[in-house]
Curated annotation (Swiss-Prot):
The lineage of its organism: Eukaryota, Metazoa, Chordata, Craniata, Vertebrata. Keywords: ANK repeat, Nucleus, Phosphoprotein, Repeat. Residues 150-159 have a biased composition (Acidic residues). Disulfide bonds: none annotated. Involved in the regulation of innate immune response. Acts as negative regulator of Toll-like receptor and interferon-regulatory factor (IRF) signaling pathways. Contributes to the negative regulation of transcriptional activation of NF-kappa-B target genes in response to endogenous pro-inflammatory stimuli. GO terms for cellular component: nucleus. ANK repeats lie at residues 64-93, 97-133. It comes from Macaca mulatta (Rhesus macaque). This is NF-kappa-B inhibitor-like protein 1. The modification Phosphoserine is found at S150. It comes from the Eukaryota. It is found in: Nucleus. The keyword Transport does not apply.
């Protein structure tokens, strides 16, 4: 008697068939909701967009081409941008061209710097180093100079060139050693002597070469030491004097702001005593005085007092440096100034000391000054 073949229950079979269909249906529903979320943003219905995301928290706020952050920057829609950042949108998310939201904000020009570029930069500073498919970073689109750590890259290039030169010298020494050893192989007078090993011979040649280079360098320094030493010491003195003036100006500004804060606090207390009925509005002055420790545009220690034309400030910095005849010293001096006034470095160091409503104006002036310094540096090449 043959055993009957096992039968699959009808309920299990229907369940296995429905699982792929249910997953596909859930995916299509999620995609429809994400498209509806983007339509709400485009139509300015931000409350409905936020409510939709609260009902369905698994939606991807960065989905779509172009992504929602890129669209908000292109339409100059600041409320939509703020909502997306609050909902967790990623400023480093790239579209099909490799652009991030910072790339899209940088292409909108100076008008979008405060409302779009700065909020994205504050949320994700690391996105400044992301390049698109054309090899551009957001800073390069804005016209900023090289990053402040370019001096380290130059040092790495110098180190790699030094390694290549040493490898080339080692190869030439090996070839010369082979020629010398082959020339004296048949000389019987040297058979009794201990032959010099290759390592000792190469070390001796390297020492002689280094001694010869040092001697030539000392002779060159001795022939023109007085003017070079004088120019070098003068350039360093100028740099030290400029740094001292920079620190002194910042210290004076802080003292003035501190005195102004104390004076405002005393005036607020004096006005509050005879008029107790108006104590509510007067109570706001100490808080305003507390904000006096932050810099406004005129409080920043610019190269020229109070700021002014970026070209004039750049010319003032160049005038304080070494003379134009000393091209090498002047290039090094300008590199130091480029690092000091680079927008990324300036924002990293002084952002917490500047009034929020003055930040856009200050960074605009710093960017213009950095570009002027870059032009002066390019003119020396």
């Amino acid at each position: 008697m043959s055993n009957p073949s096992p039968q699959v229950p009808e309920e299990e079979a229907s369940t296995s068939v429905c699982r792929p269909k249910s997953s596909m249906a859930s995916t299509s529903r999620r995609q429809r909701r994400e498209r509806r979320f983007r339509r709400y943003l485009s139509a300015g219905r931000l409350v409905r967009a936020q409510a939709l995301l609260q009902r369905h928290p698994g939606l991807d706020v960065d989905a779509g081409q172009p992504p929602p952050l890129h669209r908000a920057c292109a339409r100059h829609d600041a409320p939509a941008l703020c909502l997306l950042l609050r909902l967790g949108a990623d400023p480093a998310h790239q579209d099909r061209h490799g652009d991030t939201a910072l790339h899209a904000a940088a292409r909108q020009g100076p008008d979008a710097y405060t409302d779009f570029f700065l909020p994205l930069l504050s949320r994700c500073p690391s996105a400044m180093g992301i390049k698109n498919k054309d090899g551009e970073t957001p800073g390069q689109i804005l016209g900023w100079g090289p990053p402040w750590d370019s001096a380290e890259e130059e040092e790495e290039d110098d180190a790699s060139k030094e390694r290549e030169w040493r490898q080339k010298l080692q190869g030439e020494l090996e070839d010369e050693w082979q020629e010398v050893m082959g020339r004296f192989e048949g000389d019987a007078s040297h058979e009794t002597q201990e032959p010099e090993s290759f390592s000792a011979w190469s070390d001796r040649l390297a020492r002689e070469h280094a001694q010869k280079c040092q001697q030539q360098q000392r002779e060159a320094e001795g022939s023109c030491r007085p003017p070079r030493a004088e120019g070098s010491s003068q350039s360093w003195r100028q740099q030290e004097e400029e740094q001292r003036l920079f620190r002194e100006r910042a210290r004076v500004k802080e003292e003035e702001l501190r005195e102004s804060r104390a004076r405002r606090a005393q005036e607020a207390l004096g006005d509050r005593e005879p008029k107790p009925a108006r104590a509510g509005p007067r109570a706001e002055h100490p808080r305003g005085a507390g904000r006096g420790s932050l810099w406004r545009f005129g409080d920043v220690p610019w190269p020229c007092p109070g700021g002014g034309d970026p070209e004039a400030m750049a010319a003032a910095l160049v005038a304080r440096g070494p003379p134009l005849e000393e091209q090498g010293a002047l290039r090094r001096y300008l590199r130091v100034q480029q690092v000091r006034w680079h927008p990324d470095r300036f924002l990293q160091r002084f952002r917490s000391q500047i009034e929020t409503w003055e930040l856009g104006r200050v960074m605009g002036a710093v960017t213009a000054l950095s570009q002027a310094l870059n032009r002066h540096a390019e003119a020396l090449k």
